[in-house]
Amino acid sequence: MIRLTPRDEAIIEFLNEVKVADTQTLCNIFFNSKLRASQLRLKALVDYKYIKAYRENVISQNIYYVKRKPSQIKHSLILSRFIGELYKLGIEVLKIRVPLKVGNVIADGFIAIKYNNEPKIFLIEVENTKYLNTDKYVELKQTREYKSKFPVMPSIICISDKNNKTDDRLDIIFLKTDLSDIENLIMKL
């Protein structure tokens, strides 16, 4: 039996929140991008059954989860990789909620960050098969239902490879699913 460290407990809590994460994401968030240290500790957590691991094939990374393997692994992985990239860029992540219901809208995730000592809030939508439905967010803004949870309407981050339509009434930041254009987010912060 191994003794759980505060970092181990934070890893388990993170996996409970986002459902699934790969080795590189957990490395970026909890191990200061030290891959070998993260692999060894994650293996110990798997061996002692604190977390579970899955690998699609021999050359892919391990994918970690706590309870049972999610049905939409790719969708959940994109969201957790996005959070890992924020940590890698040195952006302070204050709060994460996956998913979050605001009024009639169920966003894939909510994230509160601090960048240049300025707090920002975002609703996250991961669209790997369909297009972003901006109508539900326009309705959320017009009915002011977001006021029950937030002081201002959060910006929307849409992670998708599709050519989604924009709406001038909303503040939407588009990112690709491989997150190769994450600098777009930093430029708009």
Model-predicted segments: where are they?
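Short, solvent-exposed loop/turn segments at secondary-structure junctions
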Residues: V18-A21, T129, N163-N164
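Active-site metal-binding core of divalent-cation-utilizing nuclease and nuclease-like domains
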Residues: P70-S71, E85-F122, N128-L132
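Basic, amphipathic alpha-helical patches used to engage nucleic acids or provide basic targeting signals
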Residues: L132-M153
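Structural beta-sheet core signal
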Residues: L123, S155-C158
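Domain-level recognition of nuclease-like catalytic cores that cleave nucleotide substrates
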Residues: I157-L189
